[in-house]
Amino acid sequence: VSSKYKIKLKTVSVLLLLLAAPLIADKTASAERTTYEERNGSSNNNGNSNSNDSSNSNDSSNSNDSSNSNDSSNSNDSLNSNDSSNSNSNSNSNGSANRMPNMLRSTNSHGTDASYSTAGFIDLDNPFFKSIGTNGRSCASCHIPSQGWTITAKGVQELFEKTEGLDPLFRPVDGANNPESPHPDQLTLEERREVYSMLLNKGNIRVGIGIPADAEFELADVDDPYGFASETELSLFRRPMPSANFKFLSTVMWDGRETTQDPTSTDCIVGTTNCFSPVSKDLATQSNHATLGHAEALHDLSEEEQKAIVDFESGLFSAQILDNEAGELTAEKASGGPRALLEQNYYFGINDTLVGDYQTGAAFNPNVMSLYDSWYRYKPTKSSTSIEIARAAVARGQTLFNTKPINITGVRGLNDDLDVEVLPGTCTTCHNTPNSGNHSTPMPLDIGISDASRRTPDMPLYTLRNKTTGEEIQTTDPGRALITGKWKDIGRFKGPILRSVASRPPYFHDGSAADLPAVVDFYNNRFNIGLTKKEKADLVAFLATL
């Protein structure tokens, strides 16, 4: 080849390298963000990062889900909606891919869930998504968008197979059944499966809490299949709480250990001196404790980092938006999906069961759920479509949730505190926050989830003895009692926010209910409700749309 052509080829090569340099630099700069998205499948089970393409997704197995011409025109949450914020879903003004789209959708066994942020996008540059500790974890390790902002057993199993159990989620500190287990890279694959079985099978994180020195009870006996628990540190296997819909939060953590009292606060339980700090303050403290504990950080989060995490969480809303059978959950003036939650009224003590509404003074209204009032018009006939039949079932389920009589008995925190053997109620007696489903004030209850009679062989069992009376109780988790030291608080836990519940099986604080039908069966058996097969199906249909 002549020297003249060599010079030309060299010149072209240099020009190509100069043109490629910005692309290479941008790709390198986004490596950390890409790692998160790859780990979690871009938080979109369809692999579709452009929300404008979501109308073509295979989220629903029912071919009629999008066939109703009225469905998309009635809602801001429509699957065909071109949210203005979505134009920035894959890049910021500098073109770096540090965002996920607003109205981020992910599939579950019942349909499709959507996440909406008041920021206009899911910001992957937030400290929530950053590894700040020493073990590679971030908040998002246990609070994954595609898993209802928590983790599911199925999701954990998929991650285990993908990484052979070496992902930062699988760390001895709280992922292993015994925190003294070797680091996963020192174990065989099958040994990892055994060591992390509670995380794999139930999506449970191990929480270690000791019995307070001044507690009214002591540990009389412990049966721990993993050989670790003692009075100094009980092993408590619990589901991570979702990190969305915090607008409606009244209690932080299952046992309320991050909910603090503040005598100067105006958020007080009526008739008591129990006043509580702003939830935002408690969440900031919780974010720091989680970083020091779960992420094994060597130093506290800065105040700026804590605020950024809390601001992100507080602006995040998540709810089911599409049902496999009923179609779009905003159709025909229904109020499903996350955006309606922004306008939903909430304050401390709203619609309180025991004393009525704290602000208006109105009596407790058991019709807590009203999302699908407009679907009461559906009366199935032989000519009804499958979607109409499904929507009628959802509406019936909502009515059952609001009004089906339940004779509430043996619930610590309710029957004993009120000194009534039988309290006539409904599901909404305990799930009283309008269209959210948690309790609007701190009110931990013991409905029997951690009773010894429900213990499975994979759970530790603790025998607690009252120091004064000698009475003994067996439980798999003392719950609130490990925070207060009070005998009466054994087995008490908060009721969770119910929105986006279809995205996050298994259920209850210990993951003991595999699916929504199992949840309904528990309550039906526990309180002898007498639900028919059709009523059970209707309740499940409703819960799946929340």
Where in this protein do the model-derived segments appear?
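Bacterial N-terminal signal peptides
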Residues: 12-22
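Asparagine/serine/threonine-enriched low-complexity, disordered tracts
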Residues: 4, 40-98
